[in-house]
């Protein structure tokens, strides 16, 4: 790709970013858009009503939202938004620090060295130069200047590992501080017990109570046995829809038609009162629900949520084998009540096993299927390939502006459009695997997305057109470093364009929230929107973290190969830091907490990125006829993996569970609290299946 084509892509995306930011700064001030750009604040403070008086300032773009987004401290984010939100922000902070250092070294040291090479001698003006002139490919084979890249790799690895260690330690400190500062939470005192043995003459509930009163008498508080409630939930969903419809009719938020004709197609029969009609249907559904609830007593599942009086008691029950038979009385930490994925208990073990096999096959098929759009995208990036495929377009493709747009902007845009449907698919696949909580489903989807992006967004793009037809390259591990060293630098221009298209424009479209804005406009146009019923969107950690980490992988691997990508990445992370602070404060609301457990994923992926950079460096120094540097690079991935193992042993156990020291100290602090009895009363029913709680919604509506 020529530098002019890259500049065209950057110019288009800069224009889109400026347009989106301008529109956002105006639209966010309009009272009618408060549920689009501030739903979290509306739900939290109930401030959905704003003055409708005309104000000229509302029509002028301003940047005051940036200042407000940067005002909250880390401690304020931790206390108001939760630990997961803080970890999400710290991923941006970590990336900004890494690529600030990388940009200084890459732009002021490595880039001039690359540019002064003579491997690609081109006597053109700067805009007509190829991107290869700014990459390590332009450095002459065997040149001593390559030792500068060698030293940069070692220094960069040390800096990344140091920052990673510091961030690990910081987040762990905040995780402990969050435990000490927060109020007692049900999941801290509760354990999920599965594999409850069947005892003749006893129900599941009686068996659980007898066991824990016998062996955990000092700390056992209560338990709730899980029931099969899938059929009841169907009735609940129908009742909820009917209740909302009845509420809208009575409030006048939809058509105030209070009567309709009964009979066939509403043309015959008596005039029926709509409110009375819906109320009777709702009453009948509630009667059916109560009947179904009364029949659920015999549909117990051999699992229960067991609550304890102390966190320490719950931790002991979680980490110690309960019965002689290791397949019975299985215990694990309970998720938050709102985090429980209740369909997990409906499926049998065999059904979950089959689902896992189906998910694995579907995931592999998706990886293979997405090679097709990758090949298409790489064909667009290559004018010669396009002319081969479509010879009748040769005249159009030779036009300067057309060729620059097609090679510089279209490939990354089309690839981004293909990727839009991937996150929902990964969430769907993960939900079929039998996870007990929504947070586990999101973590699984996050890992799947990372694998997908590594394969389809990186390796498939890098190898397509050069080594994709040689699938056996992966069966010969010795050739992998050389193949990657030859293929990766050639795709630098595509990934720079991808960063500005998917990164810059993607972030600006995130803050504009175009789809929710259009949906809000359409519902208001047809009079169907009700401010009381809108839903605050959940924080998209599982979708955004893979994208952030993938850009990190690009920056790390191209640090010494093509450092021109580094400032574009730094701009992306700075924009992301500002935009997502704004979105977390105003738009998103976490429905449940994972306790910062996304951070170990960030750590592992960063280590993988470093090792991949080292493997490419080994092959590249070999190709560049510098065998000594290639050999001296080999210890680097080994040292990096050893560092990762140390970090996992040092920090990972504290992410899986809290240490006894912290739990006992927190339990002692709770003993001095006056409202623990009230908390215990709430804890007893905290894990009651929502389907077993009788709906009283219709009773609360006055005629």
UniProtKB/Swiss-Prot annotation:
Pfam families: PHM7_cyt, RSN1_7TM, RSN1_TM. It is a multi-pass membrane protein. It is found in: Membrane. Residues 27-81, 166-355, 433-436, 513-540, 587-598, 656-703 are cytoplasmic. InterPro entries: Csc1-like, CSC1/OSCA1-like_7TM, CSC1/OSCA1-like_cyt, Csc1/OSCA1-like_N. One of its GO terms (cellular component) is membrane. Its main location: membrane. Belongs to the CSC1 (TC 1.A.17) family. Homodimer. This is Hyperosmolality-gated Ca2+ permeable channel 2.3. It comes from Arabidopsis thaliana (Mouse-ear cress). The gene is OSCA2.3.
């Amino acid at each position: 790709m020529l530098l002019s084509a890259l500049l065209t892509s950057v110019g288009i995306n800069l224009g889109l970013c400026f347009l989106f930011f301008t529109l956002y700064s105006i639209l966010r001030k309009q009272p009618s858009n408060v549920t689009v750009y501030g739903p979290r604040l509306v739900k939290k403070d109930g401030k959905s009503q704003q003055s409708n008086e005309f104000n000229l300032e509302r029509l002028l773009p301003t940047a005051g939202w940036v200042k407000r987004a940067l005002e909250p401290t880390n401690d304020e984010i931790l206390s108001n938004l939760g630990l997961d939100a803080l970890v999400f922000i710290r991923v941006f902070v970590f990336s900004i620090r890494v690529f600030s250092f990388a940009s200084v070294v890459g732009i002021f040291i490595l880039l001039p060295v690359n540019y002064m090479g003579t491997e690609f001698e081109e006597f053109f003006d700067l805009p007509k130069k190829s991107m290869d002139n700014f990459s390590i490919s332009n450095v002459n084979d065997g040149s001593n200047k390559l030792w500068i890249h060698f030293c940069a790799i070692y220094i960069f690895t040390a800096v990344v590992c140091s920052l990673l260690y510091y961030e690990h330690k910081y987040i762990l400190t905040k995780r402990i501080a969050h435990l000490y500062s927060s109020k007692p939470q049900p999941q801290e005192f509760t354990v999920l017990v599965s594999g409850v043995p069947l005892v003749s003459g006893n129900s599941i509930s009686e068996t659980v109570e007898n066991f824990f009163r016998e062996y955990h008498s000092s700390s056992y508080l209560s338990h709730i046995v899980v029931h099969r409630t899938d059929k009841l939930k169907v009735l609940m969903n129908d009742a909820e829809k009917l209740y909302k419809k009845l509420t809208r009719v009575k409030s006048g938020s939809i058509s105030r038609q209070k009567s309709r004709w009964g009979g066939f197609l509403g043309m015959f029969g008596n005039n029926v009162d709509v409110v009375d009609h819906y109320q009777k249907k709702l009453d009948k559904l509630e009667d059916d629900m109560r009947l179904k609830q009364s029949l659920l007593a015999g549909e117990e599942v051999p699992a229960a949520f067991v609550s304890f009086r102390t966190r320490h008691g719950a931790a002991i029950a979680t980490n110690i084998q309960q019965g002689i038979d290791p397949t019975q009385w299985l215990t694990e930490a309970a998720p938050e009540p709102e985090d429980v994925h209740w369909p997990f208990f409906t499926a049998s073990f065999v059904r979950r096993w089959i689902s896992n096999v189906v998910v694995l096959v579907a995931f592999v098929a998706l990886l293979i299927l997405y090679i097709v759009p990758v090949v298409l995208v790489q064909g667009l990036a290559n004018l010669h390939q396009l002319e081969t495929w479509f010879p009748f377009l040769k005249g159009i493709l030779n036009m300067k502006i057309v060729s620059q747009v097609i090679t510089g902007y279209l490939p990354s845009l089309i690839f981004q459009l293909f990727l839009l449907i991937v996150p929902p698919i990964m969430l769907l696949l993960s939900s079929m695997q039998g996870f007990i909580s929504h947070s586990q489903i999101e973590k699984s989807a996050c890992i799947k997305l990372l694998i997908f992006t590594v394969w389809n967004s990186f390796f498939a793009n890098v190898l397509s057109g050069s080594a994709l037809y040689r699938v056996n390259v992966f069966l010969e591990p010795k050739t992998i470093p050389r193949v990657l060293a030859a293929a990766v630098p050639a795709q630098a221009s595509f990934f720079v364009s991808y960063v500005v298209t998917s990164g810059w424009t993607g972030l600006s479209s995130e803050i504009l929230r175009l789809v929710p804005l259009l949906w809000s406009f359409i519902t208001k146009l047809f009079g169907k929107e009700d401010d009381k019923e809108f839903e605050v969107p959940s924080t998209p950690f599982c979708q955004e973290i893979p994208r952030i980490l993938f850009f990190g992988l690009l920056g790390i691997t191209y640090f010494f190969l093509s450092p021109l990508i580094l400032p574009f990445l730094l701009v992306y992370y700075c924009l992301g830091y500002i935009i997502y602070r704004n979105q977390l404060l105003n738009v998103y609301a976490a429905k449940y907490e994972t306790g910062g457990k996304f951070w170990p994923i960030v750590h592992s992926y960063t280590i993988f990125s470093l090792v991949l950079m080292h493997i490419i460096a080994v092959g590249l120094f070999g190709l560049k006829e510098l065998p000594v540097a290639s050999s001296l690079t080999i210890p680097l991935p080994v040292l990096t993996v050893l560092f990762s193992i140390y970090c996992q042993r040092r920090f990972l156990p504290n992410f899986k569970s809290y240490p006894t020291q912290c739990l006992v100290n927190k339990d002692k602090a709770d003993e001095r609290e006056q409202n623990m009895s009230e908390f215990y009363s709430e804890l007893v029913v905290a894990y009651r299946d929502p389907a077993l709680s009788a709906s009283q919604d219709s009773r609360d509506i006055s005629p």
